[in-house]
């Protein structure tokens, strides 16, 4: 039962000890290096088929590669995507952003305001945590919106209601989070 207390002392001590032991156990296995190399080759292969989702009048995705290990958020047209060599337009370079801001940003997705999808909420995790910082981004100017929505790091669940209102589930204080640390209260946030 002690491990069920996600942030409990015993659970955290168990995690720390497992984290201390794991690298040695993994890296001394003869299969480790070949598996790591294969995984790296797959992750950075230039012939991967890019998975995409609708983004405005085109398609978008997040794409890590050898040049941008953190990835770029990019878009292309449907016609270009159908070709052997789609032409991609970078919207946000996560590696450059991380360097400029001195953070270990990991792109955790976007949510764009329908129907134009020119204003998007970008989810950025510092170091790959579940918690994200959410910032408003303009795909037309390819920049964060000055004075736009900017929520501090948290385990948020956020949706657009309209151009000036978000529906936000986050830690609003005592009694607003589950035992696992996720929000279950939703409020409207206006500009």
Predicted segments, located by residue:
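Beta-propeller folds
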Residues: 1-191
């Amino acid at each position: 039962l002690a491990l069920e207390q996600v942030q409990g002392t015993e659970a955290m001590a168990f995690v720390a000890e497992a984290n201390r032991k794991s690298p040695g156990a993994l890296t001394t296995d003869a299969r480790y290096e070949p598996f790591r190399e294969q995984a790296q080759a797959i992750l950075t292969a230039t012939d991967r088929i890019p998975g995409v989702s609708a983004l405005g009048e085109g398609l978008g995705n997040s794409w890590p590669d050898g040049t941008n290990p953190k990835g770029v958020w990019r878009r292309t047209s449907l016609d270009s995507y159908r070709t052997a060599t789609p032409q991609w337009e970078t919207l946000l370079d996560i590696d450059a952003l991380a360097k400029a801001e001195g953070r270990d940003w990991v792109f955790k997705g976007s949510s764009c305001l329908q129907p134009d999808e020119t204003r998007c909420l970008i989810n950025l995790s510092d170091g790959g945590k579940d918690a994200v910082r959410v910032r408003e981004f303009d795909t037309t100017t390819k920049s964060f919106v000055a004075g736009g929505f900017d929520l501090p790091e948290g385990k948020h669940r956020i949706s657009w209601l309209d151009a000036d209102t978000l529906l936000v589930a986050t830690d609003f204080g005592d009694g607003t989070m589950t035992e696992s640390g996720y929000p279950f209260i939703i409020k409207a946030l206006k500009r």
